[in-house]
């Protein structure tokens, strides 16, 4: 099974890339984590609808065939770390690849969010996109560690 993080935006600060790389290498062989960064649509005179529609096309092209799509959305279902661990365990039992999708500056296309298998919220706070990548991979690693009885997570 693979966890594929599809994120709109290609450039992140060095600290975010370093943190991503650190967590990505911690995952076990049987749970691969992959980042697919897609280009942000250039801002200008385009409407928000046109921008997110263009980004949607890039996101869909980056998705693995037949994957479970989980959209990160500020109005998605809030999760605790333990609830995320339970979701991860279920995803692993289903054995399908899971794509967790992080939108661009204007979020995700509404139709894409509606079509996703799930919508989750990482926080009630508005976070920078680089921080979302790091927070997401850390929480996925923490969820794995809970399920594997690894000492990383402590109650």
From Swiss-Prot:
UniProt EC number: 2.1.1.177
Binding site for S-adenosyl-L-methionine: 72, 103, 122-127
Any one cellular-component term (Gene Ontology): cytoplasm
Subcellular location: Cytoplasm
CDD domains, per database record: RlmH-like
Source taxon at top rank: Bacteria
Primary location class: cytoplasm
Alphabetized GO MF terms: rRNA (pseudouridine-N3-)-methyltransferase activity
Catalytic activity line of the entry: pseudouridine(1915) in 23S rRNA + S-adenosyl-L-methionine = N(3)-methylpseudouridine(1915) in 23S rRNA + S-adenosyl-L-homocysteine + H(+)
Alphabetical UniProt keywords: Cytoplasm, Methyltransferase, rRNA processing, S-adenosyl-L-methionine, Transferase
Family classification: Belongs to the RNA methyltransferase RlmH family.
Function comment: Specifically methylates the pseudouridine at position 1915 (m3Psi1915) in 23S rRNA.
Assembly behavior: Homodimer.
Descriptive protein name: Ribosomal RNA large subunit methyltransferase H
Gene: rlmH
